[in-house]
């Protein structure tokens, strides 16, 4: 059948006015055809009906009640960047920033002093944390969306580069903490607690990865390690790790980072939890959102 194509927003050069396309043809095939004609990557193209309903991949025109002669609106989303690349850039920032501070702290603070053991351990924990995140971004995580607008990269990186990078580094490695002391047994407890939280977070990410086969967008109810108590144990263990970190560093900046990060994760978790309840009628109602037995 013949459908009409029209640009939504900025005019798309070389977009054909009409196209012969079967009613049961997949939206993926439609994207490929329009991409080949306009020479725009498929990730830049978004299709919608006249009422603004977005045409999703792995669906057909028939699903949206599109008939012969109907108008399909095509929007150019602009330059895109892969989500995997976004995550890698986000986590690279703190790694570079903390390394810069640890190598140049005397020059940065204009004072001759030596870092205490707590500060050195804090540096190691930060580096291990974000190296783990880089590893997960490359080898573990599967992304439901392939790309995001390139213009959003600065906004996405701000939290990690500024808050967990510059903000944490400046206030953790400063001379005001150079004489901090924690009893060895207390220090060992905090390190072991941090390691437990980080490894538990990694374990939950592996469980989530294994729930979705590669190339699939299938969604199922997660179970197992932590998931029987809360919907998002990965967020809980992430917050727990930063709690141990804040106790170790004794820095008010670490507590602010813990609060801001945990609050943001709870907002995400609350929305996703509501989606679980709506999508799965048999979803366990006893599960809390993020904090076991409480919230």
From Swiss-Prot:
<keyword id="KW-0560">Oxidoreductase</keyword>
<dbReference type="InterPro" id="IPR000626">
    <property type="entry name" value="Ubiquitin-like_dom"/>
</dbReference>
<feature type="transmembrane region" description="Helical">
    <location>
        <begin position="224"/>
        <end position="246"/>
    </location>
</feature>
<feature type="transmembrane region" description="Helical">
    <location>
        <begin position="85"/>
        <end position="105"/>
    </location>
</feature>
<feature type="transmembrane region" description="Helical">
    <location>
        <begin position="187"/>
        <end position="207"/>
    </location>
</feature>
<comment type="similarity">
    <text>Belongs to the steroid 5-alpha reductase family.</text>
</comment>
<keyword id="KW-1133">Transmembrane helix</keyword>
<dbReference type="GO" id="GO:0030497">
    <property type="term" value="P:fatty acid elongation"/>
</dbReference>
<keyword id="KW-0472">Membrane</keyword>
<dbReference type="InterPro" id="IPR039357">
    <property type="entry name" value="SRD5A/TECR"/>
</dbReference>
<feature type="transmembrane region" description="Helical">
    <location>
        <begin position="251"/>
        <end position="268"/>
    </location>
</feature>
<feature type="topological domain" description="Cytoplasmic">
    <location>
        <begin position="247"/>
        <end position="250"/>
    </location>
</feature>
<dbReference type="InterPro" id="IPR029071">
    <property type="entry name" value="Ubiquitin-like_domsf"/>
</dbReference>
<dbReference type="GO" id="GO:0016491">
    <property type="term" value="F:oxidoreductase activity"/>
</dbReference>
<keyword id="KW-0521">NADP</keyword>
<feature type="topological domain" description="Cytoplasmic">
    <location>
        <begin position="179"/>
        <end position="186"/>
    </location>
</feature>
<dbReference type="GO" id="GO:0005783">
    <property type="term" value="C:endoplasmic reticulum"/>
</dbReference>
<protein>
    <recommendedName>
        <fullName>Putative enoyl reductase C646.07c</fullName>
        <ecNumber>1.3.1.38</ecNumber>
    </recommendedName>
</protein>
<keyword id="KW-0443">Lipid metabolism</keyword>
<feature type="topological domain" description="Lumenal">
    <location>
        <begin position="208"/>
        <end position="223"/>
    </location>
</feature>
<dbReference type="GO" id="GO:0005789">
    <property type="term" value="C:endoplasmic reticulum membrane"/>
</dbReference>
<dbReference type="Pfam" id="PF02544">
    <property type="entry name" value="Steroid_dh"/>
</dbReference>
<feature type="topological domain" description="Cytoplasmic">
    <location>
        <begin position="1"/>
        <end position="84"/>
    </location>
</feature>
<feature type="topological domain" description="Lumenal">
    <location>
        <begin position="269"/>
        <end position="295"/>
    </location>
</feature>
<dbReference type="GO" id="GO:0005739">
    <property type="term" value="C:mitochondrion"/>
</dbReference>
<dbReference type="InterPro" id="IPR001104">
    <property type="entry name" value="3-oxo-5_a-steroid_4-DH_C"/>
</dbReference>
<keyword id="KW-0256">Endoplasmic reticulum</keyword>
<keyword id="KW-0444">Lipid biosynthesis</keyword>
<feature type="transmembrane region" description="Helical">
    <location>
        <begin position="158"/>
        <end position="178"/>
    </location>
</feature>
<feature type="topological domain" description="Lumenal">
    <location>
        <begin position="106"/>
        <end position="157"/>
    </location>
</feature>
<keyword id="KW-0812">Transmembrane</keyword>
<dbReference type="GO" id="GO:0019166">
    <property type="term" value="F:trans-2-enoyl-CoA reductase (NADPH) activity"/>
</dbReference>
<dbReference type="GO" id="GO:0042761">
    <property type="term" value="P:very long-chain fatty acid biosynthetic process"/>
</dbReference>
